[in-house]
Curated annotation (Swiss-Prot):
Disordered: annotated segments: 1-153, 187-262
Example GO biological process: cold acclimation
Swiss-Prot/TrEMBL induction comment: In freezing-tolerant gramineae, by cold temperatures. Water-stress induces the expression to a similar extent in all species tested, abscisic acid (ABA) to a much lesser extent.
UniProt protein name: Dehydrin COR410
Designated gene of the protein: COR410
Cellular-component GO terms for this entry: membrane
Record carries keyword Repeat: yes
Length: 262
């Protein structure tokens, strides 16, 4: 009996332990699943981030590579066009007839002189004929000033690009005078010649007659004084406004005063 009880108790204890173990196992399984899911999510996030980085980097490199290829192609095209233009400018095609009568085109390199001539303005290359265009010679310019002044004309001649100035011969004075007279005739009031203007006398108002003062009679004490008096009398008679009567009265008064003093 005791053995049965011990076995039953032992079996009961084992069953209880198993129940506890199973209970703990369920909780552990639940917790373990949650942790595993979280770990998987973290791993997935890390993997996706790495994939994004790995995908984006090659795209940038590809774009840079494409830009470099485009630049290289443009540069190569420009280089080819410049080389082709230089080769075409440096070379000329010539038609040569063979012995069989066939026309063959051959390329001939241009010289430095021909290149320079081709770059000059006004140069035309037509079927091997080089024509250099020179400007036409300009007409001689005449310089004239109005208002009575006539300057000498300066003739300018342009020959083969070199400018030469030649002074015109001096104009004689007679021609200059004739030109001045023509201008004066065209002006209003200038029909009279300067000689006629100089010949016209200038009229001024006649000045008023000026009466000369009568000189005082001198005392006569000798025959020479009488002769002087006679000359003075003649001169006084010729003067305008002289009256003999007044002069004689003055002379008589002077002699009368002189006599008593003697």
């Amino acid at each position: 009996m005791e053995d049965e009880r011990s076995t039953q108790s032992y079996q009961g204890g084992e069953a209880a332990e198993q129940v506890e173990v199973t209970d703990r196992g369920l909780l552990g399984n639940l917790l373990g699943k949650k942790k595993a899911e979280e770990d998987k999510e973290k791993e997935e996030e890390l993997v996706t981030g790495m994939e994004k980085v790995s995908v984006e980097e090659p795209e940038v490199k590809k774009e840079e590579h494409e830009d470099g290829e485009k630049k290289e192609t443009l540069f190569s095209k420009l280089h080819r066009s410049s080389s082709s233009s230089s080769s075409s400018s440096d070379e000329e095609e010539e038609e040569v007839i063979d012995d069989n009568g066939e026309v063959i085109k051959r390329k001939k390199k241009k010289g430095l002189k021909e290149k320079l001539q081709g770059k000059l303005p006004g140069h035309k290359d037509t079927e091997g004929e080089h024509v250099t265009g020179l400007p036409a010679p300009a007409a001689p310019a005449s310089v004239q000033t109005h208002g009575g002044h006539h300057d000498t004309d300066v003739v300018v001649e342009k020959i083969d690009g070199d400018v030469k100035t030649e002074a015109a011969p001096a104009v004689p004075e007679e021609e200059k005078k004739g030109f001045l007279e023509k201008i004066k005739e065209k002006l209003p009031g200038g029909h009279k010649k300067p000689e006629d203007a100089a010949a016209v006398p200038v009229t001024h108002a006649a000045p008023a007659p000026v009466h000369a003062p009568v000189p005082a009679p001198e005392e006569v004490s000798s025959p020479d004084a009488k002769e002087k008096k006679g000359l003075l009398g003649k001169i006084m008679d010729k003067l305008p406004g002289y009256h003999k009567t007044g002069e004689e009265d003055k002379a008589a008064a002077a002699t009368g005063e002189h006599k008593p003093s003697a």
